[in-house]
């Protein structure tokens, strides 16, 4: 018989494991209580907040990993984080007021500053055959002939 003194104890299962999360639910709950955001904190609030934070982190890291791969790098640096966040419309709006240290700026050249097309390039464009666009679809033309 397993009594109070000795015996087999069950392994503790954390709330993060129960929720299937990597982020620490207990620690987030402790921060919510210690931060005095409200008098009381519900039991589901830290779980939900941990899930939201984990989703946002995964989203940013995936985009930053893609940016690193585009730059032929295997390590994510702050520059890749900035490119990921600023090139994504929703994340850019969410983190509009955030400055990422050592992130740099988004590359942008005003079209006025770009060099004008050379006459040779303009002639090439003029000589290339353009497709004729008609307003009616081919099916409508057949129906109109009958």
From Swiss-Prot:
A motif (SPKK motif 1) lies at residues 128-131. It is found in: Nucleus; Chromosome. PROSITE patterns: HISTONE_H2A (PS00046). One of its GO terms (cellular component) is nucleosome. InterPro entries: Histone-fold, Histone_H2A, Histone_H2A/H2B/H3, Histone_H2A_C, Histone_H2A_CS. Residues 129-146 have a biased composition (Basic residues). One of its GO terms (molecular function) is structural constituent of chromatin. It comes from the Eukaryota. It holds the Pfam family Histone. Keywords: Chromosome, DNA-binding, Nucleosome core, Nucleus, Phosphoprotein. Residues 118-146 are annotated as: Disordered. Its main location: nucleus. Contains 2 SPKK motifs which may interact with the minor groove of A/T-rich DNA sites. Phosphorylation of this motif may regulate DNA binding. This motif is reiterated in both termini of histone H1 and in the N-terminus of sea urchin histones H2B, but its presence in the C-terminus seems to be unique to plant H2A. This is Histone H2A.1. It comes from Triticum aestivum.
